[in-house]
Amino acid sequence: MSTAQYIERRFRANKVYITEKQRMGHYTRFDLWCGLIVNVYDTGRVVVQGRIRAFDYYDPLPAIRRILPFDTSWQFSRAKK
């Protein structure tokens, strides 16, 4: 099983909704409902980028951090409320 398939299964099992999944040249891109983009490269490297939408009632980041590998690169910002 590839890293992208493993991460996709973990997202689905933990109710982190994927709005779009695209296979690019040498990586798979997951667009998440909270506004983040997760790129999973064929080498196993994972990069998170984008801007998290502001929610008064929910912070999606702790659930996403538990799912992704510990050596994930984080390049994101938070939207202002």
What are these regions (language model features)?
Residues 1-37, 59-66:
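Short Lys/Arg-enriched alpha/beta "domain-start" segment
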Residues 36-59:
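Intrinsically disordered, low-complexity regulatory segments enriched in Ser/Thr/Pro
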Residues 53-81:
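Mixed-charge, Lys/Arg-enriched low-complexity segments
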